[in-house]
Amino acid sequence: MKKLFLNYFPFIIFFVSCQFNNYETVDKNIRFREKIQTGNFIKLSKGHTYYEIDNQKSLKTLVFIHGFSVPSYIWDDTYYSASEKGYKVLRLDLYGRGYSSNLDIDYTDNLLADQVIELLEELNIKQATLLGLSNGGRVISKIAYLKPELVEKLIYVSASSFQDHNPTENKSVSGKEINNFIKNNYPTISKGQLLDFKYPENFKGWDNKYENLLQYEGFARALISTRKNHVNLDTENSFINGSEIPFYTIWGDSDSAVVYNEFKDKLNKLMPRRKEYFVSESGHLPNMENKEEFENLLFNQILKEN
């Protein structure tokens, strides 16, 4: 029995080694970008940005900002519905996510906000309604603070913009941290995406799409750096509340990723002017899990308000 185990032991090591060697093997360089058959790429000041745009002659523009790790495809349902309704629609992959460049710099809120601002300027979009999902809520808060004239409305969906954060002193990301993150998280991180749903059984295959992201070199570093650079956005959110920008918060009624009750008192103090809505039978992604109710709220109420 011992001899049999020893015979299999090298195979086990080889299998595990191959499994981890499949992670972060793809460099998102020019050859990579040339193979992408959808959307567009544009070179901005910090790197290449992947984006999709439709109905460019429409006067009403919606810009969809994704969350912490899942890129712009997380907005598929709402993006295509808005496009069919005639809105000018724009979505992009933030740096470190999807098809956009993975950078070797700090992933701050300013970096991601500046990316969106630069893209809007390059596309000659003077004003837009910004929709920020989860961590994307942080990005739209920062945009509104830096360039309020760009913003027609702000729509926060399951936004992680309002919690308290303890500043991280050392914001650098070491190779050891990256390797440990890949080793400890990558084997299960895709399956973990299903926890965003109240009824994950209705979204079979959702985790498989995420698996593709794990092959891009620099993804783990982007996630670690983003988390390390999270700071309180009280100043930005207070500014928005005191501005004339209309803003709205939308929550899934069963969100276990961003737990509303943990920060609602702070939110009430920071942004009492907001209009707030809860989508039934949905977790962290109400735009997907209860598409009908979410889109009725978005298109027939929020976007029709003057």
Regions found by a protein language model. Name each.
Residues 45, 91-131:
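Active-site loop/oxyanion-hole signature of alpha/beta-hydrolase fold enzymes
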Residues 54-99:
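Conserved HGGG/HGGXW glycine-rich cap/lid loop of the alpha/beta-hydrolase fold
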Residues 142-145, 154-184:
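Flexible "cap/lid" loop of the alpha/beta hydrolase fold
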Residues 166-171, 181-241:
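Conserved alpha/beta-hydrolase catalytic His-Asp/Glu region
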Residues 243, 249-251:
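Short beta-strand/loop motif that positions the catalytic acidic residue
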Residues 254-258:
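Acidic catalytic loop of the alpha/beta-hydrolase fold
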Residues 273-306:
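Catalytic active-site module of serine/aspartate enzymes centered on a nucleophile-bearing elbow/loop
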